């Protein structure tokens, strides 16, 4: 059985959604980031980087959301969770997930999770930079009701992690980000996503 290490509400939510959408046989283990559980010898033996998500498989541990999403899609091809049979489309899927991981996540994370919190001027600049990345998705990546057009992929669940964070912080203006807000509503309405939110003690935002 697959074992996914998560911290509720954190970015590992994307991998949790992926496994639930795939109908995978898996269990979750909570890593409490607030108490520093990610730095314990027990967890560092799973993921030496001390971060979540980490997916324990029968062949070893996979870390980083983009890698886990690709693994889940490729090991559950019947669920059509990514365009795994089209090299160009699959590259686009991976590129988008890479953007979320390397660009959008750090940008919104700086706004919300900097310790100590940013001073007013620095926070305003960080918000502007984060919103520019959301704008890029709004204007250039959303190709329909879902990121890649008419069909849901695991990239949609990943994007929803960060639109949830932005909406919760009142940064996802409904007029400026109409597409992203509508997309988030669609993702949160999916039965698999509802089950994952409930399992992590979360609710739709």
Regions found by a protein language model. Give the residues of each.
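Terminal-tail/helix-coil boundary detector
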Residues: 196-205
């Amino acid at each position: 059985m697959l074992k996914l290490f998560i911290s509720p509400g954190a970015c590992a939510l994307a991998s949790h959604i992926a496994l639930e959408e795939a109908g995978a046989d898996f269990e979750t283990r909570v890593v409490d980031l607030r108490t520093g559980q990610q730095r314990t010898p027990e967890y560092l033996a799973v993921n030496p980087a001390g971060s979540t998500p980490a997916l324990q498989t029968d062949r070893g541990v996979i870390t980083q959301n983009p890698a886990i999403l690709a693994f889940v899609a490729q090991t559950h091809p019947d669920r059509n969770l990514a365009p795994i049979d089209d090299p160009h489309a699959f590259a686009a899927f991976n590129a988008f997930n890479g953007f979320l991981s390397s660009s959008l996540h750090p940008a919104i994370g700086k706004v919300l999770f900097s310790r100590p919190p940013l001073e007013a001027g620095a926070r305003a600049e960080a918000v502007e930079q984060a919103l520019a990345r959301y704008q890029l998705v709004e204007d250039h990546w959303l190709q329909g009701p879902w990121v890649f057009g008419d069909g849901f992929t695991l990239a949609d669940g990943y994007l929803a992690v960060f639109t949830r964070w932005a909406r919760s912080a009142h940064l996802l203006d409904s007029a400026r980000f109409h597409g992203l807000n509508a997309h988030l509503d669609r993702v949160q309405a999916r039965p698999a996503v509802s089950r994952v939110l409930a399992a992590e003690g979360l609710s739709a935002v």
